[in-house]
Structure formats: structure tokens, C-alpha cells
Amino acid sequence: MKKINAIILLSSLTSASVFAGAYVENREAYNLASDQGEVMLRVGYNFDMGAGIMLTNTYNFQREDELKHGYNEIEGWYPLFKPTDKLTIQPGGLINDKSIGSGGAVYLDVNYKFVPWFNLTVRNRYNHNNYSSTDLSGELDNNDTYEIGTYWNFKITDKFSYTFEPHYFMRVNDFNSSNGKDHHWEITNTFRYRINEHWLPYFELRWLDRNVEPYHREQNQIRIGTKYFF
């Protein structure tokens, strides 16, 4: 398939350098507060005009524990409106399924390419659970969140790129996050190195706010993964 240059708009919208065509991805994560790990397997396809779709499957594990299924997810996006060669508006959505129930999300990305080596995406997203949970008042309700995220994408060299990714979550109903508040932050630093047209390994350092129950620690997470483009 045709290779897409890393500095064009498609890379900014997905916050990673991509090629048109199919790819597979494997990622492992470890949370220092919960001592829990995650293995992710993903397949995806990027279209020439900027749309994309991906299927994700995850498994969780802890020390001396067996591997347990996390969730299945399908996500897609489409560049709906591009008023200039620098500005793109792109909606997207996903559905997921796990042992406790199903859910989904819809989002709208607005990306602006300031210079060839820097672009910014602002994302507004609503996350919905189809199942009910017990809220702070003892009632059953949907533990939904409204999320605002930004992706600060820097192209350092032809092979090396960096993304700063802060996300702010607000509970829609009467629930608290793991920090004991009705809101929390998740901040990700992603470092990518393109070996060649096929291999793209990456390394992520994440802060997932403080956990007050049961770990009483800052939630720091490490992720290591790689993508292979066909």
C-alpha cells in the first residue's frame, strides 16, 4: 500500500505516524500501584482518506494470578470536514464488551497542524456504560464520564516522535473516581521510533491520578508496545 508521510494530518489525528493499509499491534502495560499488568492485541486498517478502524482485545494479570480477559473493543473514525489544509474535524466512536457488561463512547476530534513538526488535537468524548453500578447514594445508575483530551504531537526527527497527552475526566452521575473525587486526570507521555516502513516500537509513561482505595498510592503505569504495518 501507499506509504503516508508522518507529517501529514492523518498522523496527527491518530497521534501516531501511520501508513495506509493494515497493521497489527502488541502492547504490555504494568501499573505500579495495583501491581497489575495488561496485555493488548490489536488489528487495524487505515484508509487513504484518513478514516480508520481497529479491533482490540486485552487480558489482565497480577503476580501469581492467571491471565484474565479484560475487554473487547471496536473503534472507528472518519475525517468529516476539512475547511483548510491545516484544520480537520473528525468524529469517531467505539463499542466495547467485558465481563461486567458492555459500553461505548462517541468523540469529536479537532486537529490543527501548526508547522510540519507540530500539530495539536483536541478531543471531546462521552463514555457510557450500558450496565448499572451502585452510586454514592446507594442507588443504581450508569457510571458515565465526560472526557476532554489533548494530543500535543511533536516530530523530533524523521524517525523519532513524541506525544504529550493529558486527559480530564468528569463523572456525569453520583460517582467518584479512584482518587475519591468526581473528576480525575490521566497523563500519557509517548515516545515512538520508526525503524523502517514496517516496524514502529513505542514506550509510554503514564500517570493515572492517585488511588485512595485500596492502594493509597499514585497510579503510575509503564507501557511498551510495537506496531507492524503490512
Swiss-Prot record:
Residues 1-20 form the signal peptide. It is found in: Cell outer membrane. Coiled coil: none annotated. InterPro entries: Bact_OM_Channel_sf, Oligogalacturonate-sp_porin. GO terms for biological process: arabinose transmembrane transport; D-glucose import; galactose transmembrane transport; monoatomic ion transport; oligosaccharide transport. SUPFAM superfamilies: Porins. Keywords: Cell outer membrane, Ion transport, Membrane, Porin, Signal, Sugar transport, Transmembrane, Transmembrane beta strand, Transport. GO terms for cellular component: cell outer membrane; pore complex. It comes from the Bacteria. One of its GO terms (molecular function) is porin activity. Belongs to the oligogalacturonate-specific porin KdgM (TC 1.B.35) family. OmpL subfamily. Outer membrane channel protein that allows an efficient diffusion of low-molecular-weight solutes such as small sugars and tetraglycine. However, the specific substrate recognized by the OmpL channel is unknown. This is Porin OmpL. It comes from Escherichia coli (strain K12). The lineage of its organism: Bacteria, Pseudomonadati, Pseudomonadota, Gammaproteobacteria, Enterobacterales.
